[in-house]
Amino acid sequence: HREGDDLDRLATWCSDADRAVDIATGAGHTAEAILGAGVDRVVAADAAPEMVATAVASAPGVEGAVADAERLPFTEDSVDAAACRIAAHHFPDPAAFVAEVARVVEPGGTFAFEDNVAPDDDRLDEFLNTVERRRDPTHVRSHTVTDWLTWLENAGFTIETTDVITKSLDYEEWLGNVDASAERRRRVAAAFEDPPDGAAEAFSVTTGDDGVESFANRKLLVRATR
């Protein structure tokens, strides 16, 4: 998640802010990009203290906060931009997360959001989420575009921009990113060997002599205002 046009877009959407928070910052790439876009104060927030430390160390000028995405330690209307990039599929209660963002972003402020999304077809949705959980047990769920837009609107956000992009993933690199064990790799491969009808086409699966070589997933980008 270190770079890409999608990262640049999220940072640009936040660029008019004076104080921004990057929620579930991970290694801090998004927080660093927002700081680079000209925002004076950027807080890198994550539930894992070691991730906050990494983010602050890698981006001088970024502040750190250990924070649960669904219980943010900020007062109401205390930031004028919030971002969350490719992390929300780990959250147990996404509606509560969106409501928390709405609480801390001031009226007129921006929420720049990106996450993996599932197809509307229930079988393909279940296939994608099964594969993701077998790869990474911390994966909770990739939701649909409709789910996310509904949660945002219910929390009082106005949807300004939406875009769904498709990213091709190298299969071995994708597994290696989470240091998947041999057993997890076996279970992921088993799912790809017995997919529901239409999955190979929906996820642009390519195979070779040794099995899956690549597949694609979709990501939703949203710019919303409070």
Where are these regions (language model features)?
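Conserved alpha-helix/loop element of class I SAM-dependent methyltransferases that forms part
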Residues: 1-18
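Class I SAM-dependent methyltransferase SAM/SAH-binding core
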Residues: 21-71
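A short His-aromatic
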Residues: 89-90
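A conserved beta-strand element that flanks and buttresses the S-adenosyl-L-methionine
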Residues: 83
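Conserved class I S-adenosyl-L-methionine
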Residues: 112-134
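A short glycine-rich, Lys/Arg-flanked "PGG" loop and its adjoining helix->strand segment in the class I
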Residues: 95-110
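Short alpha-helix
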Residues: 140-156
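Conserved Class I S-adenosyl-L-methionine
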Residues: 155, 159-226
